[in-house]
């Protein structure tokens, strides 16, 4: 099953999205520079407000596929392309 190697919670306020709580040090997200407190607002161009939104997008992909994450960090809009890994690799 594809995994990003992060733990998230639902964001608050006008930006919403998903707040990254933890990033597995062995994950592609970590290698690409995603950090705790980053806010994921979109994945592959689709708005992300809930964990279910992110899971729905991930279900269309396989291990080894790329996922474009749009992230807010300190008011700055960033984009990261991460490769989905098998959740058993963590």
Label the model's feature ranges.
Residues 1-90:
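C-terminal recognition in membrane/secretory proteostasis and scaffolding
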